[in-house]
Amino acid sequence: MTVATTDPGKKAMYQFSYAEVLDETPKGARERERQAIDRSIELLQQADKAGARSREAIEAVLFVRRLWGYLIEDLAKPENDLPQSLRAELISIGLWIMREAEQIRLETSTNFKGLIEVSTAIRDGLQ
């Protein structure tokens, strides 16, 4: 699985091979997740400034949806070490984030600030 930005200058920092993910410690995994969520927040902030119909908005929405698709898939795995109740809450939040991103893509919402706030709270909770 690869999580990457379309910005070639930043791609290496946010691209993770499946082998790297398998070989890392839980602390390392949390740091990678934190970096990816940081990047999603940056993209959402840029999109908020540029507007919902901008190239920045398209990039942010695609990145956020891909990131949360990956995170939800990981959270749903039985071998995930997080407590079941926390996993369920994070999946619920992730689904909300993906729905909000889809509404922005469909131009029925411009709720970048809500996505930024929730993403910031999730990022700050990663340890």
Identify the role of each PLM range.
Residues 82-83:
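Hydrophobic/aromatic-rich structural module bridging two neighboring secondary-structure elements via a short loop
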Residues 2-66, 76-77, 87-127:
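N-terminal intrinsically disordered, cationic/polar leader segments
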